[in-house]
């Protein structure tokens, strides 16, 4: 037998857009309108029952004709906003998160981390709603505590509504540049094609009712009922955080999305070494609010916890467990090997170790590692190795090997991890770049900028080893010496000439340029249009092998000619390309 759980909701967005305040306001709604004795608190998340939403948003529920039509029990809001929590809410083939709220500052639009959040939500295929927050900052807006937006907008002066429309219009434009078709939620005709924008104020509570009702509508429209069904049996979940608790030792904050977790259960989860077993000693949940007499006494031990829930697990063997790891409870000891295999398969899909060319990636959790690798692949950046934890000596070695295949892959991308000083020093001495940071898109942008610089430098080095094509004509009346070396005045008709290049006439080599002079001074090269004097070393006499008015070409070895034509053609000027083609034609005569 199975029951339907509440969908998990994650709040995301740029720093200072009001994510935490919005969550606080939503939680406050739950506390104020909950049924007596109802547990709304979990470890790491908060339950907002639908009954509380109906009470809070009563008139709007009736206006939108939603009363009696919502079958979800409520919402489970993840308490930690941001991309790290969203990334760790991972499971094989997708995300544990069922819904996301992308919070945007209505006064400043879509900002850097907002774009990052948007891309992350899209990459996991999670339905989302946009909260256009800070509605109370619209000039002239008249606020009323907790009023639904649809009622509030009807009570505003025209200039406040005009400003709001302008801000929403700009936001819609910004979103369209990222491939998102969005509109104010009451104007959306097809929720399968458009993303709803709900104007909100986390300060006054305006629009919170609308946001919760739109979330309910989106969840029922886009989340299959089977996804929210919780089965009887051992628990499945994901580790959100692992930490040391005084008096308890290492504990794990876990979100359960299926089954039941009991005291004494064997758990299979993951460390950097692979699958790891642990045995539950204690399960900790927050006390119901009405039982919290003492602020220091917020928690209670329980015998079992049913999904969906957030629970603190005290267990022997949690040392080294990594956030973002899958968690499988085992009731039958014979199932432990099977659970270990499932965990091993799941984390091996995230961790990458190959001999292919690509960058090295390091991240703080399995969840963020998976998100980064997914994003890099979408951007066409191959990954040679990806793992959890700080960069190591082995990573530097791998980056050096990868660089041999392609210089732009001689790099380590480190997300939210600190590089040990000795590894940093080794990377520097090996010429390996480490790009570190806490914002994925900044790391990526820095990598793209660096790789372009490396590509340019590499091409410059290659081109400097190639002989550039050139075409010259011996100027009549400017023979200064006939031989040993011959010194003549020439005009560069196309391309470039430099000391050291060999000259060719009618496909035959006639000698090598020793020196180039212009107005009595030695120069390193002469380009098309220049008239210069050159000395030619070799078995050449002016009047025999070469004559005044002759056309000579710079000798370009066959392999280099092929490189110019098929690999580096775009780096030749038009006159150089023409000179090369004429030279090759003269060789075929």
UniProtKB/Swiss-Prot annotation:
It comes from the Archaea. GO terms for molecular function: GTP binding; GTPase activity; translation initiation factor activity. Residues 133-136 are annotated as: G4. One of its GO terms (biological process) is translational initiation. Residues 4-225 form the tr-type G domain. Residues 13-20 are annotated as: G1. GTP binds at residues 13-20, 79-83, 133-136. Residues 38-42 are annotated as: G2. CDD domains: aeIF5B_II, IF2_aeIF5B_IV, IF2_eIF5B. GO terms for cellular component: cytoplasm. The keyword GTP-binding applies. HAMAP family: IF_2_A. Belongs to the TRAFAC class translation factor GTPase superfamily. Classic translation factor GTPase family. IF-2 subfamily. Function in general translation initiation by promoting the binding of the formylmethionine-tRNA to ribosomes. Seems to function along with eIF-2. This is Probable translation initiation factor IF-2. The lineage of its organism: Archaea, Thermoproteota, Thermoprotei, Thermoproteales, Thermoproteaceae. The gene is infB.
